[in-house]
């Protein structure tokens, strides 16, 4: 008989612990050796003193003391509900507890009050896993209240990562001064501009001006004014109504103005700042070992390492390219991106992918749909969203008025009928619905949004003829309107908004590929010719990034290496338009990550990314 490997330490110990706990539970169920009854309101809980003392320092101290309770069989407990104590005792005897969002806070506080570390730790782990935007501030405050650094720091890190979303929540205004300070002093705050920190602080103060103005002298030391533009500091900070009339605050801000002129003051080590009074200062030369006051802190925040990147998304992974540094980063190694997808970056820099074919056998009425994914820069993962009904390809994807539009395209089924339908995803209700259809069926078109309006450009009709047609949709009026047509009918081209104009680059015409470029002036509703792209292409990616236009990839007709016959060939290069020289300049001959990818111009924090 084959011998079984047994850890001589771990397995017997675990077996003994289980045996002991099961035995104690059996004794309790049989009401054997019960020597203690916990009475809470009208509910009684029989138990064993030895078990309580072994589990809780609170009960151990009670039973070993000379207090009256140490001799009583019946112990009355207050400040706890019977249901909560019942769950705690169940855990003590069985290691089983059913935590929910409704009961976890009561159990957590009871575990803290009665010093039961095992339940305390279980509650901490549960709350860490349940951190979301709607509860992170409450969990942070709870961690501070119960003196639990592990929970408070986890919640604070979550808040710092999503600070610009958190400050919109009404709970933000309920933070106490010390709680707010603990957040906005962090280097890990995910903000690109320090102005956001100052504005959120003043918003918090103005929620209860009478009570909170007195907290400003201390809280202003959490803001890094030296990271702000001088013009903003002068106009918005010094000019703020709560600051310009306060002499104490003006004295504090004088330190910033001195620092802007190159004079840094340091706090004397021997001095102690008292509430409501300024610290004593001396010049840098007088005290080399002095400390800079907090108000002069100029360390960049975590979010200030955001960079303009070209993001390439395909089924092999997601890679970001930094044009200025000529460096590539892995944004996500996920290979779950569907083929034939479209991608979108919103004005809030949120990244989405729609496309592919998804089969759900449980949905008998509509088993086929398309994938809908959102990129989470915190985890570097693509998160599943409600799938798109009515799967399609060669459609347009755009955002306007906080909704995502899927416009036109071709059906992903036999016949591949061109579509005029428009699907809309409401980011408030998290649901797909139908919007007003296009005036005509179209696929392979270009689509952009600008100032809340959706522009549909060119494409092909059911008859496979290229279009010059351009129309605009106004979500506030629920109507489509025709605009001036393009000069050249085309489909499968690159398009982007740049300096309030819409650029259309290369594409497919009824006669083949084209290298022509034209520009639509939104203000005058007119088209004009532009500098041709250096090569005829289709499916070129055009992005606006950091005030410049970049053209990436696409397909060109290139000679076969053996037959010299022209064949469609995928290009993986990057071009940039030079406005001073008025020409397209190649900046990278080949970037393999662009193969089969959709391309976006985004801003991501390179500290989160893995450099290739």
Curated annotation (Swiss-Prot):
Tell where it localizes: Cytoplasm; Cytoplasm, Myofibril, Sarcomere, A band; Cytoplasm, Myofibril, Sarcomere, I band
Superkingdom of the organism of origin: Eukaryota
GO CC terms on record? A band; Cul3-RING ubiquitin ligase complex; cytoplasm; I band
Which portions of the chain have biased composition (kind: Acidic residues)? 281-290
> Which residue ranges contain the repeat Kelch?
350-402, 403-452, 453-500, 502-547, 549-604
Query: A Pfam family name for this chain?
Result: BACK
Single GO term (MF): ubiquitin-like ligase-substrate adaptor activity
**What processes does the entry annotate via GO biological process terms?**
muscle structure development; positive regulation of proteasomal ubiquitin-dependent protein catabolic process; positive regulation of protein ubiquitination; proteasome-mediated ubiquitin-dependent protein catabolic process; skeletal muscle fiber development; skeletal muscle fiber differentiation; swimming
Q: What happens when the gene is disrupted?
A: Morpholino knockdown of the protein results in a curved trunk and small head at 48 hpf. Morphants show disruption of skeletal muscle patterning with an irregular, wavy appearance of the striated myofibers and extensive gaps between the myofibers. Myofibers show disorganized and irregular patterns with small aggregates of alpha-actinin, suggesting nemaline bodies. Animals exhibit sporadic muscle tremor and coordinated swimming is not observed.
Q: In which tissues is it expressed?
A: Expressed in skeletal muscle and heart. Detected, although at much lower levels, in brain, eye and fin.
Tell me the disulfide pairings in this chain: none
> Domain BACK spans what residues?
136-238
| InterPro entries assigned | BACK, BTB-kelch_protein, BTB/POZ_dom, Kelch-typ_b-propeller, Kelch_1, KLHL40_BTB/POZ_dom, SKP1/BTB/POZ_sf
Sequence segments annotated as region (Disordered): 266-290
Q: What residue stretches are annotated with the BTB domain?
A: 34-101
Show the CDD domains listed in the entry.
BACK_KLHL40_KBTBD5, BTB_POZ_KLHL40_KBTBD5
Could you list this entry's UniProt keywords, alphabetically sorted.
Cytoplasm, Developmental protein, Kelch repeat, Repeat, Ubl conjugation pathway
Main subcellular location of this protein, as a coarse class: cytoplasm
Basic residues biased stretches:
266-275
Give start-end of the signal peptide: none
* Quaternary context: Component of the BCR(KLHL40) E3 ubiquitin ligase complex.
Q: What does this protein do?
A: Substrate-specific adapter of a BCR (BTB-CUL3-RBX1) E3 ubiquitin ligase complex. Required for skeletal muscle development.
Which family is this sequence assigned to?
A: Belongs to the KLHL40 family.
In Swiss-Prot or TrEMBL terms, this protein is called Kelch-like protein 40a
């Amino acid at each position: 008989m084959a011998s079984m490997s047994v850890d001589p330490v771990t397995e017997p110990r675990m077996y003994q612990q289980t045996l002991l706990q099961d035995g104690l539970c059996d004794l309790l169920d049989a009401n054997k050796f019960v020597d203690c009854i916990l009475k809470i309101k009208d509910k009684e809980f029989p138990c064993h003193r030895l078990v309580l003392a072994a589990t809780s320092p609170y009960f151990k101290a009670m039973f070993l003391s000379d207090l009256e309770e140490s001799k009583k069989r019946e112990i009355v407990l207050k400040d706890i509900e019977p249901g909560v104590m019942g769950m705690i005792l169940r855990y003590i005897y069985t290691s089983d507890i059913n935590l929910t969002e409704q009961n976890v806070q009561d159990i957590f506080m009871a575990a803290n009050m009665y010093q039961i570390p095992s339940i305390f730790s279980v509650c901490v782990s549960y709350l860490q896993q349940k951190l979301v935007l709607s509860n992170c501030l409450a969990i942070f405050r709870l961690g501070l209240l119960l003196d639990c650094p592990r929970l408070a720091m986890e919640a604070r890190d979550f808040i710092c990562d999503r600070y610009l979303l958190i400050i919109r929540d009404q709970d933000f205004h309920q933070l106490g001064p010390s709680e707010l300070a603990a957040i906005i002093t962090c280097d890990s705050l995910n903000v690109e501009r320090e102005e956001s920190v100052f504005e959120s602080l003043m918003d918090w103060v103005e929620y209860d001006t009478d009570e909170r103005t007195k907290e400003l002298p201390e809280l202003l030391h959490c803001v890094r004014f030296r990271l702000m533009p001088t013009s903003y500091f002068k106009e918005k900070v010094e000019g703020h109504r709560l600051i310009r009339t306060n002499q104490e605050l003006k004295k504090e801000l004088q330190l910033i103005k001195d620092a802007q002129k190159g004079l840094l003051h340091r706090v004397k080590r021997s001095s102690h700042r008292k509430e409501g009074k300024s610290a004593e200062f001396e010049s840098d030369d007088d005290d080399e070992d002095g400390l800079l006051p907090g108000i002069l802190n100029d360390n960049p925040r975590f979010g200030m390492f955001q960079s303009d990147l070209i993001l390439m998304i395909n089924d092999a992974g997601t890679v970001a390219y930094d044009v200025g540094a000529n460096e590539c980063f892995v944004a996500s190694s996920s290979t779950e991106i569907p083929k034939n997808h479209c991608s979108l970056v919103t004005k809030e820099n949120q990244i989405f992918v729609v496309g592919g074919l998804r089969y759900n056998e449980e949905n008998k009425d509509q088993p086929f749909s398309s994938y809908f994914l959102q990129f989470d820069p915190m985890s570097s993962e693509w998160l599943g969203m409600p799938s798109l009904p009515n799967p399609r390809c060669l459609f347009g994807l755009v955002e306007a008025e906080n909704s995502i539009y899927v416009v036109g395209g071709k059906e992903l089924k036999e016949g591949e009928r061109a579509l005029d339908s428009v699907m809309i995803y409401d980011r408030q209700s998290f649901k797909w619905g139908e919007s007003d259809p296009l005036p005509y069926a179209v696929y392979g078109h270009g689509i952009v949004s600008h100032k809340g309006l959706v522009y549909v450009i060119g494409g092909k009709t059911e008859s496979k003829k290229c279009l010059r047609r351009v129309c605009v949709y106004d979500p506030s009026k629920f109507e489509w309107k025709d605009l001036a047509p393009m000069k050249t009918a085309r489909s499968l081209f690159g398009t982007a908004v740049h300096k309030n104009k819409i650029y259309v680059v290369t594409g497919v015409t009824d006669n083949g590929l084209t290298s022509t470029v034209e520009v639509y002036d939104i203000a005058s509703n007119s088209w004009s010719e532009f500098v041709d792209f250096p090569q005829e292409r289709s499916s070129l990616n055009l992005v606006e990034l950091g005030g410049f236009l970049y053209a990436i990839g696409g397909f060109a007709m290139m000679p076969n290496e053996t037959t010299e016959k022209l064949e469609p060939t995928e290009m993986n290069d990057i071009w940039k338009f030079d406005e001073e020289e008025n020409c397209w300049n190649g900046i990278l001959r080949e970037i393999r990550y662009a193969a089969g990818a959709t391309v976006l111009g985004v801003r991501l924090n390179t500290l989160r990314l893995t450099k290739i």
